[in-house]
């Protein structure tokens, strides 16, 4: 099983942490396992509470049903159903910027 370095950043939240997450663990679960509290609601990819923005790297969010193609092309990802597929950097707490 592959493990990736995932950097979670957000200046307003004073967050800049790099954690290891297995390929079969969601970003949200991995953050929680490492003591990082991120916003969430449904845990099923059907709302936008946990949305983040992938700044660098690759992820798999094929289980999500909320974001449209344009939002995903801008890097938005629902962290409750997003799995790392490479080392990556993700801006957290992005729901206010999801238009």
Curated annotation (Swiss-Prot):
Q: Looking at the keywords, is Transport present?
A: yes
Which cofactors are required for activity?
A: [2Fe-2S] cluster
Q: Name one GO molecular function term.
A: 2 iron, 2 sulfur cluster binding
Q: Name one GO biological process term.
A: heterocyst development
Q: Paste the cofactor note.
A: Binds 1 [2Fe-2S] cluster.
Under the heading PANTHER family, the entry gives: FERREDOXIN, FERREDOXIN-2, CHLOROPLASTIC
Quote the record's miscellaneous comment.
Answer: This ferredoxin is expressed by heterocysts and differs from the ferredoxin expressed in vegetative cells.
Report the protein name in the record: Ferredoxin, heterocyst
Source organism per entry reads Microchaete diplosiphon (Fremyella diplosiphon)
């Amino acid at each position: 099983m592959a493990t990736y370095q995932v950097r979670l950043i957000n200046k307003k939240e004073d967050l800049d942490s790099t954690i290891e997450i297995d390929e079969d663990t969601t970003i949200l679960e991995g953050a929680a396992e490492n003591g990082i509290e991120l916003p969430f609601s449904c845990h099923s990819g059907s709302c936008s509470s946990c949305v983040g923005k992938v700044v660098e790297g690759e992820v798999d969010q094929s289980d999500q049903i909320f974001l449209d193609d344009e939002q995903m092309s801008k890097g938005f990802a629902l962290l409750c159903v997003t799995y790392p597929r490479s080392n990556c950097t993700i801006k957290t707490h992005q729901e206010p910027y999801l238009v």
